[in-house]
């Protein structure tokens, strides 16, 4: 399903998804250091590959995508297809509900 057809997200469900599938490599806490992946605090409205102190792949820097709900929804379906050459090893979330839930959580937790 495209972003326009995405269901409304549930942030409580999204938090569970984040903790089980994302938190090993990412944090959302303001001022926290990077893990295997960059800190996601301030994610919305930010350009890919621009967080200070994190070593991004050239692919992430060169993609120069602005992270918003639609771009993240598409990216999270298949990160390696969206940004070929990304270091992110996560295969993606195939279910539209899971992507919508994760985005609802990220919107709240990274602001």
Curated annotation (Swiss-Prot):
Q: How is it modified after translation?
A: Binds 1 heme c group covalently per subunit.
Q: What does this protein do?
A: Electron carrier protein. The oxidized form of the cytochrome c heme group can accept an electron from the heme group of the cytochrome c1 subunit of cytochrome reductase. Cytochrome c then transfers this electron to the cytochrome oxidase complex, the final protein carrier in the mitochondrial electron-transport chain.
Gene Ontology annotations for the cellular component aspect, listed alphabetically: mitochondrial intermembrane space
Q: Give a Pfam family name.
A: Cytochrom_C
Its source organism is Nigella damascena
Q: Which cysteines are joined by disulfide bonds?
A: none
Major subcellular location class: mitochondrion
Amino-acid positions noted as binding heme c in the UniProt annotation, renumbered to this chain: 22, 25-26, 88
Q: Which residues form a coiled coil?
A: none
Q: Which residues carry this modification: N6,N6,N6-trimethyllysine?
A: 80, 94
Annotated protein name in UniProt: Cytochrome c
The UniProt transmembrane annotation reads none
Q: Which residues carry this modification: N-acetylalanine?
A: 1
Q: Which UniProt keywords apply?
A: Acetylation, Electron transport, Heme, Iron, Metal-binding, Methylation, Mitochondrion, Respiratory chain, Transport
* Family as reported in the entry's similarity comment: Belongs to the cytochrome c family.
PANTHER family recorded: CYTOCHROME C
One example GO MF annotation: heme binding
> Which cell locations does it reside in?
Mitochondrion intermembrane space
